[in-house]
């Protein structure tokens, strides 16, 4: 059992953290260096690129910081919940959603599930419910980043850092880490948004974004990008940032969110290499569920867009790009949530069939 619980610890966290810190430092240092070069055109492009990389690094590092703090606060309870409350498919899905919402990583949930299967604590059919529910848990991140509270980001970082550094109580330190991580998420989004604002008048980029209205292109681009960064939440966050600048339509944002769901399967597949057969089967279930879900919904993107537009908050006093930028981020987050909940409800009745298919 101890070997399974050790799976909770994030893999390769040190290299990833070092990469994020390097990207942040590069983004900070780029401005003065390029300003001294005297090449205005080149300076603008490189400055924009470094701000994007630096903002993305802050966003990812903030997610990591918040997730680590959440796991420190509720980690042991999450492991107990995951091991015990999966007696049927519906409880499994609810448990997977709750655990993933807390730890902010469907990949970590999948790794834990693999460990429980290998130890005989969970059947393959039970694990499928948890894997399906994990997708619902990841929608929490999109809902959080859709809030426009970037002006409070630096205050959140400062307060969180103070709690983390000066408090004597471990719980206060952990809550401070959560607050600082959340502030870094919003500050990273603000940096990325500022970096992309000049692109509003750059026609080739606008034409490229218009091509994302083709759902197949949007899904492919997001799947590849998510596979590279190994974080669907990062992809969704960037999509919401682009939407906040009015670069993409709601339908394009939905297609990109679909692609992120497929791309996140890469992490589980890589983690299953060289592992027991049960690990490979769980990873295959993850891929099948996400791909089948996108296949069901790809022809319904327009209807999904109409539905979330109907119940999402809007700003009728605005028009044109300004209204698109104001309305679309929350609509994309809501579409992402509706898609994952509905897909889980559609397939939750077929966990036995999924299990037999991968065990065949």
Go through the PLM ranges and name each one.
Residues 56, 76, 80, 84, ...:
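Alpha-helical transmembrane segments of multi-pass membrane proteins, especially transporters
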Residues 42, 46, 50-51, 55, ...:
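Alpha-helical transmembrane segments of multi-pass inner-membrane proteins
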Residues 21-29, 51-65, 96-100, 157-166, ...:
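Hydrophobic core segments of alpha-helical transmembrane domains in multi-pass membrane transport
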Residues 100-103, 109-137, 143-152, 160-164, ...:
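Membrane-interfacial helix-loop connectors
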Residues 64-72, 113-118, 159-173, 268-274:
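C-terminal ends of transmembrane helices
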Residues 1-35:
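N-terminal secretory/membrane targeting signals
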Residues 276, 298-335, 341-360:
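Membrane-interfacial segments at transmembrane helix termini in multi-pass membrane proteins
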Residues 35, 39-85, 89, 179-224, ...:
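Helix-loop-helix hairpins and the membrane-proximal interhelical loops
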């Amino acid at each position: 059992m101890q070997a399974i619980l050790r799976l909770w610890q994030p893999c390769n966290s040190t290299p990833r953290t070092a990469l994020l810190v390097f990207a942040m430092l590069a983004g900070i240092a780029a401005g003065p260096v390029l300003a001294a070069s005297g090449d205005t055109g080149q300076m603008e492009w490189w400055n924009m690129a470094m701000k994007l990389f630096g903002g993305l690094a802050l966003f990812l590092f903030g997610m990591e910081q918040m997730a680590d703090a959440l796991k420190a606060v509720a980690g042991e309870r999450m492991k107990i919940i995951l091991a015990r409350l999966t007696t049927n498919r519906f409880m499994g899905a609810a448990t997977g959603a709750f655990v993933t919402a807390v730890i902010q990583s469907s990949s970590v949930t999948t790794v834990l599930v693999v460990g429980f299967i290998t130890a005989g604590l969970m059947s393959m059919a039970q694990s499928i419910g948890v894997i399906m529910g994990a997708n619902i848990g990841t929608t929490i991140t999109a809902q959080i980043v859709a809030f426009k509270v970037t002006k409070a980001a630096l205050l959140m970082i400062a307060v969180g850092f103070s709690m983390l550094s000066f408090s004597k109580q471990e719980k206060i330190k952990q809550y401070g880490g959560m607050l600082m991580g959340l502030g870094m998420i919003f500050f990273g989004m603000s940096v990325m948004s500022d970096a992309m604002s000049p692109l509003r008048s750059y026609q080739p980029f606008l034409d490229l974004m218009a091509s994302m209205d083709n759902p197949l292109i949007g899904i492919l681009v997001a799947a590849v990008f998510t596979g590279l960064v190994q974080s669907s939440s990062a992809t969704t966050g960037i999509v919401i940032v682009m939407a906040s600048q009015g670069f993409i339509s709601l339908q394009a944002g939905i297609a990109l969110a679909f692609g992120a769901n497929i791309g996140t399967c890469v992490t589980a597949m890589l983690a299953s290499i060289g592992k027991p057969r049960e690990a490979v089967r769980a990873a295959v279930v993850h891929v099948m569920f996400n791909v089948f879900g996108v296949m069901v919904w790809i022809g319904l993107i327009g209807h999904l867009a109409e539905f979330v537009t109907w119940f999402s908050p809007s700003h009728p006093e605005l028009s044109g790009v300004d209204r698109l930028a104001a309305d679309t981020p929350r609509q994309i987050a809501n579409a992402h949530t509706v898609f994952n909940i509905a897909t889980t409800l559609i397939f939750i009745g077929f966990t036995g069939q999924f299990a037999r298919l991968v065990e065949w």
